[in-house]
Structures are given as C-alpha cells and as structure tokens.
Amino acid sequence: MGVYTHKFKTPFEYGGATYEELTFNFERLTGRDMVAIETEMQMNNEYALAPEISRNFQSKMAARAAGIGSDVLDAMPLPDFNRITNAARDFLLSTGY
C-alpha cells in the first residue's frame, strides 16, 4: 500500500515527456513533506481541513511521492487522476490519518 505503480492505458504526454507508468513511493515521504504541502496550499489560499478527503492535497502528495510536479497530475485524464489520488488517500488512511 505504501508504493503504487500506475500504468496508463495509453501513454500520457505532458510538457514534452511521455509517461507509460509512474511509481508513487508514499513510504518515503516525511513529516516535512506534509508540512510543505500544507504551506504550499496556504500560499495559494488553498486549504485542506481533512487531507484524506482533499483531492488537491492528495494530488500534491502523490506528485511528491513520484518526484513530479503537481501540474503533471492535474493535466492527467480524470480516470488516471482519480486512481492515483485514491492511492494517496488509501495510504493516508492506512497510516492512521
């Protein structure tokens, strides 16, 4: 549950890169990552009262876990975005959040 590999049905292209799969290593994230995500959101006047139900928070967390920008996730087709953010949510819940 701490590592999720997402395989795209068709390659996803964004910013000159083509993605066939992405691996999200949620286990490598630290408390600093959580705080950094919250800080980034606050700087943009975005808030997550409950990260486990905030798609915005989950997408930023997933981006960090994969080492990509959150803009990459935001540009994905909705089914892929949903599966990836669901994996982030499941990880948060598994850690007792």
Protein language model features and the residues they cover:
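Short, surface-exposed, charged amphipathic helix/loop patches that serve as local interaction elements
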Residues: 2-97
